[in-house]
């Protein structure tokens, strides 16, 4: 849908800064109306006439939209290629889940990219959707996923999307502002249950959570780096261009492939804590306990 809308809108509006900003605003409005409005109407109809079907569909959508399992599966493909395959195979596997250039990455670089992706997407793909589902049910979760998908497709700071994708990127920053910070603290708390470095996770989270151009991306990366006692982030190539980025965490020990497995354990721990916290929040909203 987003790709089709982009193609149509680019043909309608002039190819200048104002036209691209206007077109970008229009695509944001249309995607938000569709992603939030359609599930709302479908569930409203089903709960009115076929309540059991409405419940089943809502549960199915919840399962489909929470990316915990897929995030683990994709990152573990990288781990498997690092342990049992070639470096080129590992580079290809990680290229499927990151936006940076991976052709020249070392084993350490591939591992760091996978760990960073697990950390960042624990918020975007799991904890943030759970929060929005707790507040507004599946329709609000769909709306959030629409915003997040727009950012992943349009939110690049290159010539093609600098203006066209600006509103989508800013809206994603707003939508993730609170969830990212909750996710960071849930990861810190998750170290208690995974045997990781709780003290360092809290220290690095508070110190390095702003070490990123995005106001949200470093939140979970900082908690993850501290929990694992490693250093993440740093300079990276995107579309053939080197971007200088600050590091996150201290290199107490070198990054190793096993950190991908550890990152997934921490992601699951944070997600389970999120289920508990957001379940209580949802119960409070639904049954008036927060009034």
What are these regions (language model features)?
Residues 1-142, 155-291:
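Hydrophobic alpha-helical transmembrane segments
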Residues 146, 150, 154:
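Active-site His/Glu-centered metal-binding helix of metallohydrolases
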């Amino acid at each position: 849908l987003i790709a089709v809308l982009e193609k149509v809108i680019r043909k309608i509006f002039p190819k200048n800064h104002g036209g691209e900003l206007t077109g970008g605003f229009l695509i944001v409005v249309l995607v938000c109306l569709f992603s939030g409005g359609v599930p709302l109407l479908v569930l409203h109809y089903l709960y009115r006439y076929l309540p059991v079907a409405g419940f089943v569909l809502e549960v199915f959508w919840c399962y489909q939209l929470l990316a915990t399992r897929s995030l683990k599966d994709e990152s573990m493909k990288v781990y498997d290629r690092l342990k049992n395959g070639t470096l080129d195979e590992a580079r290809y596997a990680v290229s499927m889940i990151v936006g940076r250039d991976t052709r020249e990455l070392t084993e350490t670089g591939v591992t760091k990219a996978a760990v960073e992706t697990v950390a960042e997407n624990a918020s975007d793909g799991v904890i943030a959707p759970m929060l929005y589902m707790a507040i507004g049910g599946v329709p609000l979760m769909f709306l959030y996923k629409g915003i997040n998908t727009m950012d992943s497709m349009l939110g690049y700071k290159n010539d093609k999307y600098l203006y066209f994708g600006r509103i989508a990127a800013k809206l994603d920053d707003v939508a993730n502002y609170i969830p990212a910070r909750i996710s960071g603290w849930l990861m810190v708390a998750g170290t208690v249950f995974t045997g990781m470095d709780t003290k360092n996770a809290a220290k690095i989270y508070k110190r390095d959570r702003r070490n990123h151009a995005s106001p949200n991306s470093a939140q979970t990366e900082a908690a993850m780096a501290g929990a694992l006692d490693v250093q993440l982030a740093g300079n990276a190539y995107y579309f053939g261009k080197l971007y200088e980025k600050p590091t996150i965490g201290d290199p107490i020990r070198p990054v190793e492939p096993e950190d991908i497995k550890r990152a997934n354990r921490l992601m699951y721990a944070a997600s389970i804590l999120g289920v508990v916290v957001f379940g209580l929040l949802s119960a409070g909203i639904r049954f008036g306990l927060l009034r």
